[in-house]
Amino acid sequence: MQPALLDTSVYITALRAGSDALGTLRRLAPQAPLWLSAVVLEELYAGISRRDRRVVERLERDFERAQRILVPNLNDWSQAGQVLARLAAEYDYEEIGRGRLTNDARIAMSAGRQGIVVITANQRDFAKIARFRNFRFELTAV
């Protein structure tokens, strides 16, 4: 079974749904080894409420113990920049448009390198990135 990671959009939806929602996320990839992107972790910490902080801390601890935290390497950063430049040219993005896609590009580059499928609710951005970098993503409505 191909490994998977959940995008920030999936975790945020689950956190908003309530305390038990994170436990049900496993059903999105029941047989797949799950990974946590360091980029997703950063986004979660940056945007969570005090109430949800312990949930995210537990996620970090559990994935770190399992040695399944995916950290972008130098090549991922370089490829993300190249993809963002191509997206800017293709879609006439200004700096804000590119900035919005930066984290998603790093997630896509690192997941693609490791053969990990990204499970997301954000079709718009990941579909654009996929035009310029081969990686797998699947949509979910959570």
Locations of regions flagged by a protein language model:
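Active-site neighborhoods of divalent-metal-dependent phosphate/nucleic-acid chemistry enzymes
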Residues: 69-117, 121
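Short, hinge-like loop/turn segments at secondary-structure boundaries
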Residues: 51-55, 87-88, 136-139
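Alpha-helix capping/helix-boundary segments
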Residues: 10-11, 40, 76, 107, ...
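General small-molecule cofactor/ligand-binding pocket signal
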Residues: 35, 70, 138-140
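Short, well-structured N-terminal submotif of metal-dependent ribonuclease cores
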Residues: 1-36, 40, 46-64
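Generic structural signal for small/hydrophobic residues in well-ordered secondary structure
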Residues: 7-8, 44, 80, 111
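Phosphate- and divalent-cation-binding pockets in alpha/beta enzyme and binding domains
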Residues: 14, 43, 79, 128
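Acidic, PIN/NYN-like endoribonuclease modules and their adjacent C-terminal/linker elements
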Residues: 3, 108-142
